[in-house]
């Protein structure tokens, strides 16, 4: 029996959430109704466009382009800086809302998720009707709109949600691929990017249908395993398994009980750095990327709390794990003395699998004030080389042979460590 999978995507999420928040705080102008963007620094006019309104799009403004270029296209463009903490909170509320219907939910990023409708179809009826109900409830409850794509497999549901926007429901059943998807430009297929387009065009591939009907062995010869993957995407071949938090439970983690209670942010972050080193090293040794990280705190009165968030791009980088862990810690910690700190990564995938890049690989925020020497900036290759160099030294001379300067603590903080 075929499954029924929803892909739900917030329309221009960062701009929508900023607009809703400003309206709640008394702003008279809706950012979604004027030429506006999210991104950059208004004073310096540096950075890139992270999200744009429909009217900004009419001026030719595109996501990912430099702010200065966008302003040349539209002189009266309104620019709003990003608020990542607020976006994560809106995302959390939305996911909790979906869970009132079903626990079978797989969050892909802050603004999109898969939902397995199959187990609840008998309760709510025809899927398109329920999807319309769902998107209308979101609009009324939260004030922003979503698109819902529906199919038997995840890749087609995701493609369907990218059809006409905003505030729409679309189906892309396997029987509809030839009619709805194959005529589209190949650039619109999920995971086909700028680097692969020239190679595809050299092979005479211009539409998704061209790709779908190409001999996959030829694609593999030119694009290696990636060629096979996009051929499968073009033919609607993919997983129908929605990996909820429960099914994606396997992960890599580490926690440490502290010799003395920690009462300041700086010391806590040094401990988080050491934990990030340990966890990321084990991920790299095992050949995994992590899609999610959680931070756990146990206070001196032995009460516990934890907070988790997805990475924008799956990673095994020490810097990225540390950066997000620090953000989670800052949101979670209530100021009480800390007895134990822990980090756990989950939603593991083989590091050889293709990874969808995020705009945030180009523009890290500056929320984390420590360790900027390796968390600030976009140079992914330098981060990977640093991690590899440290891994090689530890493998040859032992774990204590090299540490980052900022993790040198006068007195050893850790009493005991526990791996997961």
Regions found by a protein language model. Give the residues of each.
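Preference for bulky hydrophobic residues occupying beta-strand positions
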Residues: 8, 115, 148, 295-297, ...
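Short, charged/polar surface micro-motifs in flexible loops or helix N-caps
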Residues: 11-13, 42-45, 300-304, 348-351
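Gly/Gly-Pro- and Ser/Thr-rich, intrinsically disordered tail segments characteristic of DNA damage-repair
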Residues: 1-232, 281, 369, 377-420
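A glycine-rich phosphate-binding loop feature that marks nucleotide/adenosyl-phosphate handling sites
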Residues: 152-155, 234-236, 289-300, 338-349, ...
């Amino acid at each position: 029996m075929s499954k029924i999978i929803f892909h739900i995507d917030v329309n221009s999420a960062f701009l929508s959430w900023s607009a809703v928040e400003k309206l709640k705080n008394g702003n008279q102008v809706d950012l979604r109704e004027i030429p506006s963007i999210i991104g950059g620094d208004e004073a310096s006019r540096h950075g890139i466009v992270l999200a744009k309104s429909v009217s900004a799009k009419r001026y030719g403004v595109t996501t990912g382009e430099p702010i200065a270029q966008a302003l040349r296209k539209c002189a009266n463009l309104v620019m709003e800086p990003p608020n990542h903490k607020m976006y994560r909170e809106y995302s959390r509320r939305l996911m909790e809302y979906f869970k009132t219907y079903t626990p079978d939910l797989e969050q892909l990023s802050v603004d999109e998720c898969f939902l397995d409708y199959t187990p609840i179809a008998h309760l709510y009826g025809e899927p398109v009707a329920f999807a319309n109900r769902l998107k209308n409830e979101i609009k009324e409850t939260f004030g922003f709109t979503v698109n819902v794509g529906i199919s038997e497999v995840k890749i087609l549901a995701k493609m369907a949600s990218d059809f006409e926007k905003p505030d729409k429901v679309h189906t892309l059943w396997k029987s509809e691929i030839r009619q709805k998807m194959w005529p589209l430009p190949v650039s619109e297929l999920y995971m086909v990017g700028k680097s692969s387009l020239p190679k595809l065009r050299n092979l005479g591939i211009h539409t998704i249908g061209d790709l779908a009907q190409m001999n996959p062995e030829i694609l593999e010869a030119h694009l290696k395993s990636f060629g096979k993957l996009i051929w499968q995407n073009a033919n609607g071949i993919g997983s129908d398994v929605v990996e909820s938090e429960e099914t994606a439970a396997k992960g890599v983690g580490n926690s440490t009980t502290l010799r003395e209670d920690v009462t300041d942010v700086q010391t806590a972050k040094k401990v988080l750095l050491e934990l990030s080193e340990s966890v990321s090293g084990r991920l790299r040794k095992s050949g995994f990327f992590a899609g999610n990280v959680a931070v756990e705190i146990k206070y001196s009165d032995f009460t516990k709390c934890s907070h988790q968030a997805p990475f924008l791009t799956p990673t095994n980088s020490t810097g990225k794990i540390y950066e997000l862990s620090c953000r989670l810690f800052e949101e979670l910690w209530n100021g009480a003395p800390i007895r134990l700190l822990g980090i756990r990564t989950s939603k593991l995938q083989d590091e050889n699998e293709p990874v969808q890049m995020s705009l945030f690989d180009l523009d890290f925020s500056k929320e984390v004030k420590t360790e900027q020497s390796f968390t600030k900036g976009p140079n992914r290759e330098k981060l990977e080389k640093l991690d590899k160099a440290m891994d090689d030294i530890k493998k040859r001379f032992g774990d204590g042979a090299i540490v980052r300067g900022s993790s040198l603590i006068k007195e050893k903080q850790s009493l005991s460590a526990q791996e997961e």
